Structures are given as C-alpha cells and as structure tokens.
C-alpha cells in the first residue's frame, strides 16, 4: 500500500511539474540575449516593438501587456518564444 501511494505521489509531481515557471527573454533591442524566470502563474512572454528617433525599439518580458496604438505586440506561451 505504501508503495502504491508513493508511486501516485511521484506520478502526480511529474505530471503537474510543480514549481515550474515560464522563462522569457528580457533584453532590450541593442543588448546581448538574457532571459529570466517569470513570476509564478505568469504563463506568457511578450515582444513589444515601436519606432522613435533612435530607430526600432524592442522590449521583451513576461506577461502580455496592453499597448497604445502604433506599438506592435506579440505574445506567446512557450519557453523563450519572444526573441
């Protein structure tokens, strides 16, 4: 009985992937690639692009923010998908 219970606990942990956090790129357009672990419950990454006097600006991070008109936003839900 103990073996069965232990097996069920292990299977549950493996299937639920407890403690898993999404990883997203967070480097600005002109910087080397970096990524970070998102807060628990944050399951998406974003890539936000716009143009100003410096050229095309790219911002990356966790979540899927609301943006103003004229800003291109791409949201995705896999590891490091926002490059």
Curated annotation (Swiss-Prot):
Q: List the disulfide bonds.
A: 24-45, 38-62, 64-75, 76-81
What InterPro entries does the entry give? Snake_3FTx, Snake_toxin-like_sf, Snake_toxin_con_site, Toxin_cobra-type
Annotated signal sequence range: 1-21
Q: Name one GO molecular function term.
A: ion channel regulator activity
Keywords on record? Acetylcholine receptor inhibiting toxin, Disulfide bond, Ion channel impairing toxin, Neurotoxin, Postsynaptic neurotoxin, Secreted, Signal, Toxin
Found in which tissues? Expressed by the venom gland.
What GO cellular-component annotations does this UniProt entry give?
Answer: extracellular region
Cellular localisation: Secreted
Protein origin, superkingdom = Eukaryota
Please name the Gene3D superfamilies in this protein's record.
CD59
UniProt key word Disulfide bond: yes
Q: Does the keyword Protein transport apply?
A: no
Q: Which Pfam families match?
A: Toxin_cobra-type
Function field: Binds to muscle nicotinic acetylcholine receptor (nAChR) and inhibit acetylcholine from binding to the receptor, thereby impairing neuromuscular transmission.
> What is the protein name stated in its UniProt record?
Short neurotoxin OKI-17/NCA-06
């Amino acid at each position: 009985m103990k073996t069965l219970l232990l097996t069920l606990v292990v299977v549950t942990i493996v299937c639920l992937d407890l403690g898993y956090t999404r990883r997203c790129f967070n480097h600005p357009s002109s910087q080397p690639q970096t990524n970070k672990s998102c807060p628990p419950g944050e399951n998406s990454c974003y890539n936000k692009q716009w143009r100003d006097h410096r050229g095309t600006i790219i911002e990356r991070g966790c979540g899927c923010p609301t943006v103003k008109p004229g800003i291109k936003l791409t949201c995705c839900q896999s590891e490091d998908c926002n490059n």
